Amino acid sequence: MKALIFNSGTGSRMGTLTANKPKCLLPLPGGETILSRQLRLLSQHGIREAVITTGAYTGLIRQQAKCDRMEITLVENPRYAHTNYIYSMFLAEPTIAGNDLLMLHGDLVFEEQVLTRLLAASGNRCCVDLSAHLPKKDFKGRLRDGCLQEVSVHLFGQDCFALQPLYKLDAAAVHAWCREVSAWIRRGQVQVYAEEALNRIPEQLHIQPLACDGLLLSEVDTPEDYQAVWEVLNPCRN
């Protein structure tokens, strides 16, 4: 199993915090960054290969993307300023093809128990919080017959739930999703989320929800998100 971590974005909503660095290199309590914490936890749970997509800060990420017992490959998206991570996923496809995959965003902060549950769960999985209020600007998911049917920031309703971009996928699901991503790229649709491709083929992926209610699992999109994560992590390292 490999990990695919998306770090091609500019982090514009973070203001001065990302004026000269990507979000993944923001410091956390204990002397780690978001990225180094992700890599440490992934490595501790047996992930030996990580593919990291990059954009404006390839050099900085290359300097700091280091972890014992883990082989790290960078995939640069030279069109980062004009594309969304659907294009980064397209570029990364040759490095992940044929592998089971953990796919996550580079600004995602999570506690160790999330990985423990995710890796122990059977089948393809997405991470959800069924008890959380639906966020206005972040991902929500919708289920049908117990499987993920749709992911979007625009979903609202009683059948929707908060979803964080952390997926466990087998090689067949990776292949199907990447094939649909390639179709979108061929049509020039490069400014959408990779989940737009997922939404066209949910029946091929069979992704079930994994409830992570009460656990730390949060994207850092704003300074307020960053402060909240810092406060949760400050008392302890894990």
Kindly label every feature range from the protein language model.
Residues 61-63, 68-139:
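Conserved beta-loop-beta/alpha segment of the NTase-like Rossmann-fold superfamily
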Residues 9, 30, 56, 80, ...:
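Short beta->alpha linker loops
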Residues 1-58:
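N-terminal glycine-rich phosphate-binding loop and ensuing alpha1 helix
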Residues 13, 60-63, 113, 176, ...:
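Phosphate- and divalent-cation-binding pockets in alpha/beta enzyme and binding domains
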Residues 1-3, 162-238:
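Conserved alpha/beta core of the MobA/IspD/sugar-nucleotide pyrophosphorylase nucleotidyltransferase superfamily
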Residues 2, 48-51, 71, 100, ...:
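Residues at the starts of beta-strands that form the adenosine-phosphate
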Residues 25, 141-143, 209:
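A structural signal for short hydrophobic beta-strand segments in well-ordered beta-sheet cores
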Residues 111-188:
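Conserved core of the sugar-phosphate nucleotidyltransferase
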